[in-house]
Structure formats: C-alpha cells, structure tokens
C-alpha cells in the first residue's frame, strides 16, 4: 500500500506497474477483474493494447478530432441543472444525491453515449451489482456475473441498433469507426461501453455530493462562491484533492521487483495506490487537512500542469479519460447550487455513506433551505 504523493506519482508512471489483473500471482486474490465473460476494458489493460483502445475512444470524445463533444455540452448542462433545481421550488428540504448529484451525470452520460435515459432503472440495478466487484468482501460473484450477462445483452442490442441507424452519439461513432486504429470488436465495444457508462456517472455523483457537503461545512467558502462564481474552478480542484470520489486504485501489479522508499515490492504482488492519502501528503501540500480552494489560485501560486497538484484523477497513462467532463458537470452543479439555494444547511451531519470502499461519497444528503432563487431562464 502506497500512501505518499511522490511514490504514488512515480508508480503511476512506472512501466513495470501493470493495470492488468491477469499479472497477479494467485496469492494476491480478491482484485476486481472487470466484467465476467468480457475482455478487459482499457482501464484494466497495459500498452500497447491500452493505448490503442484509448486512442480509438479519444478520437470520438476530445480535441482535435472531436472538439465540441464536451465543450458543446455546456448549454445543455446548464439546462439540466436548472431544471433539476427548479424541481426544488416550493419545498424546504431535498436529497441532493437523489435529486441532483445522481440524475445529472446519468442524463449527461446517456446523452453522450446514446443510451435511452428511460432505461436508467434497468442499468442502475446492473451497475449497483457490478460495483460490488470492487469490494471482494461482499461475496457477490454470482450477482456480478448475472448483472454482467444481462447488461451485455442490453448493450449488444443497443450497439446493433446504433450501427444500423447511426446518430451523433459516441456509441454510433465507435460502432461505425473506420479510423486509422481499425475497428473495435463487438466484445471490445461492450467493455468500452460498460466502462464509459459506469466511470461516467458513478464517480461524478460523489464529486457533486462530496462538494455540496464540504461547502455546507465551510459556509464562508460557500458565501464567497456565491459572490464570486469564478471561484468554482478552484473549489472543484480543491474538492478533488480534499474529498476525492476515487479513494484508491486497487488493481495495480508489480511486473518486476520494484524498489521504492527503501522497500522491495516483489514481482507479481498487488500494489494499492492510496490516491486520497497522497493528495493529503504533508510533504506535498501545506496544511493538507484544510479545505482551501485558494491553494489553486493561479494568480497567487501559479498552477502547474493539469494533474500536478492532486491525485483525484490519477496520473500517467490511465489519467482519467473523462476529467474535462467531470469538471464541467461539478462546476455547473455546485455553481448553481451556491447561487440558487437561499440559506442552505445540512439536515444530517455526517450523512449516511455508500458502502463502496473505492468510490467514496454520501448515499443520501438531506439539505434544508429557505427559498430558491429563480433560474436565469426564468
Ligand atoms: C469526478 C469524477 C471522476 C473521477 C474522480 C474519476 C477518477 C478517475 C481515476 C482516479 C482514474 C484512474 C484509474 C487508474 O489509474 O486505474 C480514472 C480513469 C478513467 N476514467 Fe475517470 N473519473 C471521473 C469521471 C469520469 C467520467 C465522467 C468519465 C467518462 C466520461 C471517466 C472515464 C474514465 C476512464 C475511461 C478511465 C480509464 C482511463 C484509462 O485507463 O486510460 N471518468 N478516473
């Protein structure tokens, strides 16, 4: 288990560290291996296969080939957030998880991928089961297998439909891709769809919920954010450091004997990277347990390269693929909450948490308020 910033960064960039669970020796059991019956997604692959699959998907998600996929979503995001907060009007208390933090990223990733929004109740059940594979103690192998099979059937139908009648979404683009990297097989399309759907919402929900909770615990920061909307960029960056949605990465393996911090990690052993601890390493940041968005003020401290300051999105070749989208969603949701909720306060502190050890965030977050400021459109 590695918990210090410098060593984690070193290992994230070390080619002798694999993300493929097949490299584990038998003694290191209990590591999630992805979805049973499907090939690993690129999250669980090493170069060169990782790089090829990531490049294929990137072509349809980010500049230079697809410059507007994320940026072009900004107006739609504002509309979705505005609509969800409009739903709070006339009430004095809401569950931020169920009524904003979860429905927002679900709506966005469905639209992006071309998954019908009304199918959420179906895939929600499968995803809940699949996430249990992150926690080997639940003993849910049969449930995980069943959920994987049902979700694969569902996505097979969806991919075939998009191939026959392609739209402007990512599943259509991936299913009909004839770019320089060659086509994805049907199995690769399935594992990529699973990865994007799950990574695309199960993490962002925690960033928005952890963010709301943290801001309500620091009312002076919330008040500053209300008066200075530009501050939201720093707030989200500091949240990724201070209350990250992904606490640790449990699926790395040493491909060789690796010397680090006067310790030898033997070949074949499992390496757990404690990203959240690394982001609070006192040798890396000043006063690490203080929530202080100003530490990301570029005018005061000169923000270095993306990802340099915290490990919220990991690092190296597996650096979060969806980081620009996650940032935009959290900035929009938290900015609008700060602007529109009048006198917001926590009803229960601490709130009940999800039981997942990797993905950390509240299961529910009851927030009371006096009124709702009308939306800009209103
Ligand atoms: C606040 C929200 C998010 C957080 C905190 C987060 C965090 C992370 C982290 C820590 C990793 C690295 C895992 C590793 O090193 O093994 C990662 C990888 C990844 N994330 Fe995110 N993520 C978020 C949102 C998203 C979104 C919205 C998407 C999709 C649109 C996404 C897609 C991915 C993918 C595909 C990978 C695998 C990248 C690779 O293996 O090359 N993530 N994410």
Task: Give, region by region, the residue ranges found by the protein language model.
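Cytochrome P450
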Residues: 1-378
